[in-house]
From Swiss-Prot:
This protein's name: Beta-agarase AgaO
Biased composition (Polar residues): 471-481
Keyword presence, Transmembrane: no
Region (Disordered): 169-208, 355-481
PROSITE patterns per UniProt: CBM6
Active site: E661 (proton donor), E832 (nucleophile)
An MF annotation (GO) of this entry: carbohydrate binding
GO BP annotation list: cell adhesion
Length: 1175
């Protein structure tokens, strides 16, 4: 099997081929024939009741062996007159799936697998010729073993095998069993015997004296490499910087060794071979790096002596050879020889730092540095244990417990230490007490004639009336002609509850999409401390850890493409203990690190990608969703703290999302070969595996984190046809090619995608389909939602922060309740929200790229807070330092970065790209704006749906948050009631707005009297913090209840109707109508043809609405800005309804002005224990 390189596609992974290929039945001319019954020995492990592990029988005049079970084997002695390549053919039969023959050779006492061959299910006695590829055999007497290597208990019957001599070099395929291997897995068993020397020792094999390791026979591989035939043998190419080959051996006797590499390169500089090996204490350490010089090109090999001799110690020995130079492409390598020179030299000093290796605490010291008596140089030490190496530490005696900056000096990590609105670098008075207004210098005591907090020298409105907050120019609402005015009323004594939930939920919603253990925070401990401990932000979310730990998982030695579950126990313990031993992590409380975790599609999910991202570092990949689900259960049990391991290590995630945004990669150029049904079933399997492993200690499990969130639209992503991969699959045997093509087609095939190009696909299939198939196994539904600002301006923005997000949530909630009842409703986790724009990816960073995101953060959070019972966790998308997203791809991790564009969505940015000078982005202002807000939600209302308001009381403080969804400055007429006898001491105003250059401004002002007016700028957010002299008494309540309407279609799927053609009748039943004061609202979730909002002649209006025969006046202004750039106007229309028209069972008639669809009709009633103040 091969793939056409002219199409730029890497060779297909052996693991993928295994599931795809049915082998040719063409006969092979035999030079040697070995009858199966002529074995010299048999063995095995499976007890099948026979006298011995393998039996002999006769059928159709043929004598053959049978009762070969998994783990059984037959051994033969073969006299090979001439070394060379041989084509191997079996005459075997089986009646089951999952049978495989492993061809093994005894190599110095160790059995080495040269070929693995799947046996097709064609009948036990149907002995058709089965080509098994080519193998290399040495001359002389050879011990051969045929091993039952498949995953079924029963394996195969065998008549005979034939060997046909090819020549004395490797085959045209590059050697080994490339065309017949089914593992593609760890390279210890993927045709490694094809090298010119007959191969390397198998994993764990014994070596002594001088020994040779073939490059293509590495037991484990890191990175993305390939093999090719050259000079009568096989070598490794595509060896990049950081790639490695690893061998796990057992050395019989210690000794001093001289490594020699047979290598080539076409580069004149920047190429080096790095060598790591286990030391006398069993630790894997760097031994040396050796520069590789070009001898004329990639195929001009030469023998390179390593830069120094090394000691190798007896016992278990790991050797790792890696690309250590600066060039992306490093070298090709054929083999390495370890020449034993003498016994161990205990005086050997491999890094030439003056300390013998056996006494050297820091091997690999840079020659340019001077080591201490323990062999450690400043770059290898951190004397004050502040996380900054001594050679970079400008404050080398930091006190224990201090958080430090990138130079090792104690720092708060803040950009405005005294929170006076003046950045540290501009603040001439850095310790201003809270409650004081400051001048632009950051100092108090300035002249301010009208006491508005704006210095006379910059005050453009010098006679501001009392009780009015001003804007940045010193002008209050009554001094400027704001085009719009809105009344906001707060009743601080009335608790607002939804299904019993009334708290702000700071740890649920003031969160950041990062973790304390990310390398992004190395050198920025002060900033992490500021974010988490000072601003009281809860972390985080993590998909990357599971990704690399899956890549790190070894293959089960007895089951191809299956994780080694025993290895996971050991490896998990090692990593948990590493976490437990890190004192830095203990400086952050557990309630500040409540984790949402999960996995990315590659390589955890069986994407079948033949690119490097589809496989593990050990060169195996999952082929079935059952494999990945089994790994997931084992991973959570053994890699996280729980009762089974004494609660040692990483805290168990609170939430587990099964897979992150698979729709963005499924059937696209990102190479994810799968279908909707498989992903749904995968969620079921993962949930079952995790719960079976952890029981009631399992995290809450959820999905589907779709990347698309326009329920009314068709699929927004172009996808490959089911036969798309045919063009890249090429085989010499037409049968092989056809089988491989069919395998990929079946993996892509689906029964639910006929409507991909039709409206409502994203709901009918992607969301509803998932809920129907896997909802019963989910603890929560996981949602992502983003605005898409225009590339160059706001004119072409597609916004979901209007009524779009409420519409999404109402549809999910209604259908869940309709199917399962209110008692079984699943909550929502919004694990990503914000704004993104693909058109920015290659552009230089601009302030607007941050301000547009902040608008979305604030508006979406305000909507999330309206549903405290339903959205149990939310998280803005705020990666810390996402070098993985820098452009062009991969540049962020180069030794010398030369990126042309950053990833624009991050907490930390470089003002100058590639400078490594990391500063807070404006994202930190989001957390500064929301700092300290906590407490009990209290009654607050706005007279305009485009002005959002939420209010919370926390002891003696009242927080009022107001956000503007519109693009015009608005006067807020503010009324605060219910403070009883508490006396005001201070009101702090935090004002986040955006100037004409799109810079984000966060200003702070203070007032000692109750404000009555304040300007809310376009897209701005205000926080008013009232401090009183005593606790605010919350002595009344309002209870909000939602009553779910009947199916708008009368119960017929898909539960939506066209609104064209006259009035539509709806029903909301079983309503408990309050007898006291109450307020109610009809909520209609619609997708209408777009039109301008908030105008009498808008196509978005309702012509008539009646409830139980009563005509209801409907608004002309819906939630969200007047101008919108959307394909459909997707919104939940919120219509005030007099409570006295409601009954237990309510008949609703609604006639829309124009066309579209209606999906959900609900009633919301707020029942008060007292009559609230209304402005």
């Amino acid at each position: 099997m091969r793939l056409s390189k002219s199409q730029g596609i890497l060779p297909l992974a052996h693991a993928v081929l295994a599931a795809a290929i049915a082998y040719s039945t063409a006969a092979t001319a035999a030079d040697y024939r070995l009858e199966a019954e002529d074995f010299t020995n048999v063995g095995g492990t499976y007890n099948d009741g026979q006298p011995q592990k393998i039996s002999v029988y006769t059928v159709n005049g043929i004598t053959a062996i049978n009762y070969v079970n998994k783990g059984d084997y037959a051994e033969y002695t073969l006299s090979v007159p001439q070394a060379g390549q041989y084509d191997l053919t079996y005459f075997a039969g089986t009646a089951i799936d999952g049978a495989r023959i492993d061809f093994q050779v005894n190599n110095n006492g160790s059995w080495q697998t040269l070929a693995r061959t799947d046996v097709p299910n064609a009948g036990w006695d149907n002995f058709q010729p089965l080509p098994a590829g080519s193998i290399h055999l040495s001359s002389g007497s050879q011990q051969i073993r045929l091993f039952g290597g498949g995953d079924h208990d029963w394996q195969w019957n065998l008549d005979k095998m034939e060997l046909a001599y090819i020549d004395d070099s490797s085959s045209s395929s590059g050697g080994g069993s490339t065309s017949s291997s089914s593992s593609g897995g760890s390279s210890s068993s993927s045709g490694s015997g094809s090298s010119s020397s007959g191969g390397s020792p198998e994993e764990g094999g014994h070596v002594s004296g001088t020994f040779k390791l073939e490059a293509e026979s590495a037991h484990h591989v890191g990175g993305e490499i390939d093999t090719y035939a050259i000079n009568g043998g096989v070598a490794v190419n595509y060896f990049n910087s950081g790639d490695y080959l690893e061998y796990n051996l057992h050395l019989d006797q210690s000794g001093l060794y001289r490594p020699k590499y047979y290598v080539s390169t076409a580069h004149s500089s920047g190429v080096a071979v790095g060598l790591m090996a286990t030391d006398h204490e069993g630790a894997l350490v760097t031994k040396n790096t050796s520069e590789v010089q070009s001898q004329g090109g990639w195929d001009s090999f030469y023998l390179l002596n390593a830069a120094s001799d090394i000691n190798l110690f007896s016992g278990d020995l790991t050797i790792r050879i890696y690309g250590a130079g600066t060039q992306d492409f490093q070298f090709n390598i054929d083999y390495v020889i370890f020449e034993r020179i003498s016994d161990v030299d205990l005086d050997l000093d491999g890094d030439s730092d003056g300390i013998a290796d056996v006494n050297d605490s820091c091997p690999g010291t840079d020659p340019s540095e001077t080591a201490n008596s323990e062999g450690c140089a400043p770059s290898q030490l951190d004397t004050d244990k502040d996380g900054i190496a001594d050679n970079r530490d400008q404050c080398p005696t930091t006190a224990p417990g201090d958080f430090v900056d990138s130079e090792g000096c104690a720092s708060t990590g803040a950009d405005d230490d005294d929170l006076d609105g003046i950045a540290n670098q501009e603040d001439q008075c850095p310790d201003t007490p809270f409650g004081e207004n400051v001048a632009p210098s950051g100092c108090t005591g300035f002249e301010d004639s009208d006491s508005d907090g704006i210095a006379n020298g910059t005050d453009q409105c010098p006679s501001t009336p009392a009780k009015e907050f001003t804007n940045e120019s010193g002008c209050s609402p009554s001094q400027v002609a704001n085009p719009h005015s809105v009344k906001v009323t707060v009743n601080a004594n009335i608790k607002h509850s939804v299904k019993g939930i009334s708290d702000f939920g700071r740890n649920r919603h003031i969160t950041a999409h990062t973790t304390i253990y990310e390398k992004d925070w190395e050198g920025h401990a002060d900033k992490l401390n500021y974010l988490v401990n000072t601003l009281d932000v809860t972390l985080g979310r993590d998909n990357g850890t599971a990704t690399w730990k899956f890549q790190d998982t070894k293959e089960d030695p007895n089951r191809e493409n299956w994780p080694d579950l025993d290895y996971m126990v050991t490896r998990g313990k090692e990593l948990r203990e590493n976490y437990e031993a890190n004192p830095f992590y203990k400086r952050f409380s557990a309630d500040r690190t409540e984790l949402i975790a999960g996995t990315n599609p590659h390589p955890t999910y069986p994407t079948l990608s033949w690119n490097a991202n589809g496989s593990t570092w050990h060169d195996w990949q999952p082929m079935h969703i059952e494999t990945s689900a089994a790994w997931m259960g084992q991973y959570l049990k053994h890699y996280y703290a729980n009762s089974s391991n004494g609660y040692i290590g990483d805290p168990m995630p609170k939430f587990w999302e099964v897979i992150n945004e698979p729709d963005m990669e499924m059937k696209t150029g990102k190479f994810m070969v799968t279908n909707q049904e498989a992903i749904w079933e995968y969620h079921n399997l993962v949930a079952q595996e995790i719960r079976s492993k952890l029981g009631n200690e399992a995290p809450l499990i959820g999905g589907m984190t779709w990347g698309q969130h326009d329920f009314y639209r068709r699929d927004g992503i172009s996808r490959y046809a089911d036969n798309a991969y045919d063009q890249w699959i090429v085989a010499d045997d037409p049968a092989e090619e056809a089988a491989a093509e069919e395998f990929f087609r079946q993996a892509m095939a689906t029964t639910v995608d006929d409507t991909r190009d039709q409206n409502w696909y994203q709901w009918d299939v992607m969301w509803k389909g998932f809920m129907d198939a896997a909802g019963h196994n989910m603890d929560f539904y996981s949602v992502h939602v983003y605005d898409w600002p225009g590339v160059n301006s706001d004119a072409k923005s597609t916004l979901r922060r209007n009524g779009h997000l409420p519409a999404m949530l109402d549809m999910i909630e209604w259908y869940d309740v309709y199917q399962n009842g209110q008692a079984n409703r699943k909550p929502i986790v919004i694990s990503e929200y914000g704004a993104v724009q693909g058109g920015w990816n290659t552009l230089a960073h601009q302030p607007r790229f941050e301000s547009e995101v902040l608008k979305s953060f604030n508006a979406m959070l305000m909507q999330i807070l309206e549903r405290p019972d339903y959205v149990i966790k939310s998280m803005p998308f705020t990666p810390a330092k996402p070098l993985w997203g820098y452009y062009p791809g991969g540049c962020g991790y180069e030794e010398v970065r030369n990126c042309t564009a950053p990833y624009h969505y991050s907490l930390l940015i470089e003002p100058v790209l590639n400078s490594d000078n990391w500063q807070w982005s404006d994202y930190i202002k989001f957390y500064e704006l929301w700092a300290d807000i906590d407490g009990t939600r209290v009654d607050s209302v706005s007279s305009d749906p485009d002005v959002q308001v939420q209010s919370y009381v926390n002891n003696n403080e009242l927080f009022i948050i107001i956000n503007n969804l519109e693009t015009v400055d608005t006067t807020i007429d503010l009324t605060v009631a219910g403070l009883n006898n508490a006396q005001l001491q201070n009101v702090e105003l935090r004002n986040m707005h955006f100037d004409n250059n799109f810079d984000t401004q966060l200003e702070r002002h203070h007032m000692k009297q109750m404000p009555t007016k304040v300007t809310l700028a376009a897209d701005a957010t205000l926080v008013l913090r009232y401090t009183l002299n005593s606790t605010i008494a919350i002595n009344q309540s309002v209870d909000e209840k939602k009553y779910f309407g009947n199916s708008v279609s009368g119960g017929s799927v898909p539960h939506r109707i066209s609104v064209a053609g006259g009035a539509k009748n709806l029903q909301v039943n079983n309503v408990s109508v309050p007898s006291g004061y109450a307020e109610s609202q009809l909520r209609l979730t619609v997708a209408l043809y777009p039109s301008q909002d908030d105008t009498p002649d808008s196509l978005l209006q309702i012509d008539t609405l009646t409830i139980n025969g009563h005509t209801i006046e409907t608004p002309i202004d819906w939630r969200g800005r007047k101008e919108n750039s959307v394909e459909r106007y997707f919104n939940t229309l919120e219509i005030p309804v007099p409570v006295d028209v409601l009954q237990k069972n309510n008949t609703i008639s609604v006639d829309f002005r124009h066309n579209g669809e209606l999906t959900v009709a609900n009633l919301v009633i707020k029942e008060y224990t007292t009559t609230p103040v209304r402005h």
